[in-house]
Amino acid sequence: MELRVSNTSCENGSLLHLYCSSQEVLCQIVNDLSPEVPSNATFHSWQERIRQNYGFYIGLGLAFLSSFLIGSSVILKKKGLLRLVATGATRAVDGGFGYLKDAMWWAGFLTMAAGEVANFGAYAFAPATVVTPLGALSVLISAILSSYFLRESLNLLGKLGCVICVAGSTVMVIHAPEEEKVTTIMEMASKMKDTGFIVFAVLLLVSCLILIFVIAPRYGQRNILIYIIICSVIGAFSVAAVKGLGITIKNFFQGLPVVRHPLPYILSLILALSLSTQVNFLNRALDIFNTSLVFPIYYVFFTTVVVTSSIILFKEWYSMSAVDIAGTLSGFVTIILGVFMLHAFKDLDISCASLPHMHKNPPPSPAPEPTVIRLEDKNVLVDNIELASTSSPEEKPKVFIIHS
């Protein structure tokens, strides 16, 4: 049996969590029998105080770091894929794996791995509804770096779209819940047995298999949404696995018996399969389509699926007020509008320098003066007939009847 204290000391009114196998019991101290406080209880209360006071901000900082690393990794991986195309090797979209021999691609992969580790920690300390929308920062970083290092165009409207994405993410962070609803691996296992989540997971898995084996071979190279939707749907499983493993690590250092629980091993297998699938199809999308187009659309779909999964699995929105729910939804819609501006107007040549020279309607060119020919001016008509016949001798002669 494991014991964990939820308050700073074992005073009257303090709460005790008792764990026995997969069961949890919450007890309250109603009378002091001894003035001494066990050292073990003091240690756990210190951990609980750190989690309650600083856990949200630690998760927020790790999410910022993760966004920067992931946004930079896309550029490095794209440069590796471009170098692969220059050598004439089989492209990733055609089933080639030549990028595995490229140092630039591996640099991008390791950078992405570091970003995912930071993301891993962020999900362990903060709710998924907070961490996931901060991926908009990686959209901003990826779009800006691609314009400098990949020579991909990013006009004024695209930059404005990036700013709108960041503003929407800020609104979501302000209104998102700060308290986690699942704090132990036993609670995670109980949530995953819920009927609503099981139905949701089965629907995602079936749709993903249809996309991979039926739709992607036919339309994947022509439609950018196919590969991106596959990565986004798989992302729901990877985020749930990351969240569960993060909770497992925290519980391990808290002294809970997580090693004997089967769920961490199942989540590790799910994470390995989902990440490998995501990397494969994201490489195919980056190999064909523009980076500044792939990453924003991927962010919108990925965030939508993950937030929906978090609502169903972790029930993070159940304790939120109507104002916070409306603010979170408004922030997400703002992000979608920013992403739309980022890729819908990417081909327009608009910059700050060109704005003063743009006119609503160009000035009309002066109309030519009409030539007036009177009916009685027979000499002019005859001259026109002669000029027409001499300029194009191959044409058949035309007969004009002049009425006097």
Curated annotation (Swiss-Prot):
According to Swiss-Prot or TrEMBL, what is its membrane topology?
Multi-pass membrane protein
Tell me the residue ranges located in the Extracellular compartment per UniProt. Answer: 1-55, 124, 175-195, 245-261, 315-324
Question: TM spans, by residue?
Answer: 56-76, 103-123, 125-145, 154-174, 196-216, 224-244, 262-282, 294-314, 325-345
Query: Cytoplasmic side of the membrane: what ranges?
Result: 77-102, 146-153, 217-223, 283-293, 346-404
Q: Name one Pfam family in it.
A: Mg_trans_NIPA
Q: Which residues are glycosylated?
A: 7, 12, 40
Enumerate the UniProt keywords alphabetically: Cell membrane, Disease variant, Glycoprotein, Ichthyosis, Ion transport, Magnesium, Membrane, Receptor, Transmembrane, Transmembrane helix, Transport
Question: Which family is annotated?
Answer: Belongs to the NIPA family.
**What's this protein's name?**
Magnesium transporter NIPA4
Where does this protein come from, organism-wise?
A: Homo sapiens (Human)
What gene makes this protein? NIPAL4
